[in-house]
Amino acid sequence: MRTLTESRRRQSGSSGCKKDSESDDDENTICSRAAIKRSVVYYLKNSTLHGLKYIAEESITIPERIFFGLAFVLVVILSVFFISNVYVKWSASPIIISTSAKQKLTSNMPFPAITICNLNQALLSKVDRIGRTSTNFSLLMGLCDQGGDTTISYIGTWKYFKAILVDVAQPCEKMLLYCSFGSREEDCSWLFTSILTDDGLCCNFNALHPSYLIRNYSDDVRLETAHPNTRYELIDWTPEKGYARNLPEFYFPRTSGGTGIRMGLTVVLNASIAEYYCTKSMSVGFKVLVHNPAELPKVSNYGFVVTAGREARIPIEPVYEDALPTIRSIKKSVRRCLFSDENDLAYYRTYSRKNCELECEAKLLLRECSCVLYYLPRIDPLARVCGPNDNQCTDRVQTEIESSLTNLSCENCWPGCFELTYRATLSTASIVSDPRFQAGENLPEYIFHGPYSNASEISILHFYYMTNIFRSTTKSEMFGFTEFLSNTGGLLGLFMGFSIFSVIEIFFYITVRPYCASRTLRQRHKRRLEQLSWLTPIRMPVRRALRRNRGGLLRNPPPPAYSDLQKFRGKLDKPETCKRKLWRTLQVRPVVDRADEELPTYPYLD
């Protein structure tokens, strides 16, 4: 009897999900099927989603409920279909390139870097002093693409090759006769510096100083002796960051002083046709390239030619591409552009597509030919410079890189998200040096009447902006998360009346409501135990009566004393409910002879 009583006490005091069939309140247990069904019906009737309340409506017939249920399923399928179309469009083309609504000033952009190369790569007077059987002559012939002795296995350093090129090429002070910028004549040596390109030694204007362009810069990179420039201060500039806020009065690279020929760059060049020895073209004159100040030029393939004896006008239009910071969250393979801090180059400090392609070409040559061409980035300080014996290998690699049809390609060099390029057009006319011809150009007289008065050897170039404003293009998100969310929410609201509050409702009915119901049941069970705690002293008389009647059957166990019940009368429930609770708490199951015999009654509980 005691074991049975303790077992029933544990069963009645558990807070699990088992339902006690003898308790009216336990029928509301949260884990019961009936409770779950009632919760689902309650949600359907009170949900903000369209059509669900008709499924749970009891006043309509079952076919009508089925109709609304199928309609709701169809609406969900249509919503998923249209949302998937929006997602495919969002994931396939997340970037849109649009014209900026705000115009930019050319004065906020650097004037383009201009590289000018004489088509003659070696002066005849300098070559005559080199022995025809020497290694230097063979290297020179390799530079001129005239073969040379390809049996010579040249193993030299970049410093040695640089010395040969500087020695035989036309220096900038001999090529540049006159320079003016911003309507002011200036010393050409202050404006132009020597630079090595794929066309040999050239003269460059307005490029970044090598200390801002190259990592691990040293004086070995310099081609000429540095001369102090007390007027212009060298500063850093990148397409992404632009100029610093506080700029000196005179700085380099320079910005445009205005529009038109007078405010642009004007140079007078001397071709020195009598000194021509070798050239990569079939004409005499100059090859010119307009490029970004933060990039090294490749003049051989991309420069335009101005023949000697011609005057050229070259109007320039800047083309600037920027990007919004929001596209950083998009994968690189999707947006197809890189920010400056996302792909550091080994040799250059500033990332651009052309700088990346130069490094890529150097790496491929080093891998395939075990050497690097003299004008390419020296990614390996110990790598040798390619000589005449490497021409066959270097030509093959460069052809494959430019064709982009083989494994030797630089497809991973994506454009920068911020890039500045320049669009230049060329128009030329013949120079007339007849003294009877009255020229309107504000050029010095000594150019036409001095030692370089031969008009057939002179070229005049004018670089200038046509306008001081331009429009840039901006890369931005075509579909940001906000746009995707609004499109999705619009479709769900159109088909189902869905909103953020619908999500809150679902969360409430799955988590908050079951928790609150379970907590309420536990509190109700706890109060019930407190109400029945007064029956504990009453059990002793009953047990003594059981021991006295151990020999017979206890038909009706004696009830507790009436005086013990009197003080707890305020806690009693309804009479019938209290009788059943009292009988279960006593844990005494009477032995009955007939199955239909009624439970014992306690009249004083009324």
Swiss-Prot record:
The keyword Secreted does not apply. It is found in: Cell membrane. The chain crosses the membrane at residues 66-86, 490-510. It comes from the Eukaryota. GO terms for cellular component: membrane; plasma membrane. Disruption phenotype: Flies do not exhibit any general drinking defects, but do exhibit markedly reduced water-elicited proboscis extension reflex responses. Abolishes water-elicited spiking activity of water gustatory neurons. Expressed in water-sensing neurons in taste bristles on the proboscis but not in carbonation-sensing taste peg neurons (at protein level). Expressed in the tracheal system. Keywords: Cell membrane, Ion channel, Ion transport, Membrane, Sodium, Sodium channel, Sodium transport, Transmembrane, Transmembrane helix, Transport. Pfam families: ASC. The keyword Transmembrane applies. It is a multi-pass membrane protein. Residues 1-26 are annotated as: Disordered. InterPro entries: ENaC. One of its GO terms (molecular function) is ligand-gated sodium channel activity. One of its GO terms (biological process) is response to water. Belongs to the amiloride-sensitive sodium channel (TC 1.A.6) family. Osmosensitive ion channel that mediates the cellular and behavioral response to water. Plays an essential role in gustatory water reception. Part of a complex that plays a role in tracheal liquid clearance. Probable role in sodium transport. This is Pickpocket protein 28. It comes from Drosophila melanogaster (Fruit fly).
